[in-house]
Amino acid sequence: MKNIFIFLFLFINSAIFAQTTFQVSFPNEKGLLDGRLLLLLSKNNKAEPRFQVLDGHDTQLVFGLTIDNWPSAKPQIMTTGNTFGYPIEALKNIPAGDYYVQVLLHKYETFNRKDGKTVKLPMDRGEGQQWNLAPGNIYSKPVKISINPKSAQTFKVSLDQTIPPIEEPKDTKYIKHIKIQSKLLTEFWGRPMYLGAHILLPEGFEEKKDVKYPLAIFHGHFPGDFDGFRTTPPDENLPNDYNSR
């Protein structure tokens, strides 16, 4: 009986300590960090893991951890106990094998709202709330690793890359871009807030200053510019490409 208890003790302890953990550092950051730390694992290198988290069956793995006022000089340890994943819920349940690992911090900002509440949210930076493209987010370069759930492993990951700002679209003869600060939104969110628009102008707009035109408004989903417009006709010899539907 004593031997059975010893065996169970050793078995349970080996299961507890045989964990895969990730030690994440922030070498280029200063001060405190807020945001969602995302651990990304992919079985292939067709693209960076941050671009392979999808809604379909072929999605790769992601595990999240919210950090709040985290000292940037202190590494963050990601384990099965403090992360939540998709489509695999627990980090400990990752099958053994080779993976490409990448970690990204989707940064949050503090808003002191007019209603008296203080919230931390990911401010849109022109990318349309796409965490894997948001300027200012920091991430690591993909690295190939081998995971063995039966052994204790710690992988060190350095978030030394930064997503650059999005280049503003340029005005043309027919397409203009405006950005207006909203008084109501600025007052509510406690910081300058803007509304933007891409404007398609009619022929002769610059010459006919006294002419009034009808206005058609289309609310897209964060388009980077006005699409579907060109000043040259398409090639007459292009073959027809019919949709199967």
What function would you assign to each model-found segment?
Residues 16-19, 29, 92-96:
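Short, surface-exposed loop and linker segments with low hydrophobicity and enrichment for Pro/Ser/Thr
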Residues 43-84, 89-245:
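Non-catalytic cap/lid and distal C-terminal segments of serine-dependent acyl enzymes
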Residues 1-22:
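Bacterial Sec-dependent N-terminal signal peptides
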Residues 19-26, 30-37, 193-198, 217:
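Contiguous beta-strand segments within globular domains
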